[in-house]
């Protein structure tokens, strides 16, 4: 089985959400490790946000069926992005037989995008 998901977001939307909601925004959408790795850079947070949406699309459920923190976007030892699933997202991936994930992130000052592919 092959599944894919893609998402793009305006970085300004993330900036606006941070200004409007502050720590509540961070705590709702990102794990502590994601926040540490993003180093306060809004484009990096926007790319992670887009990646979570893309993973949910690849799972075939949309983000409403899984928790935002059930999908974690981190860096591996070579600083490449990687997907770690927890909770409902992990259970859904297992039920679909999805075992390997690949992710590509990109951002400018205006937009961030993510493409994910899962195979099983």
Model-predicted regions and their roles:
Residues 1-120:
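Core catalytic alpha/beta fold that binds nucleotide/phospho-ligands
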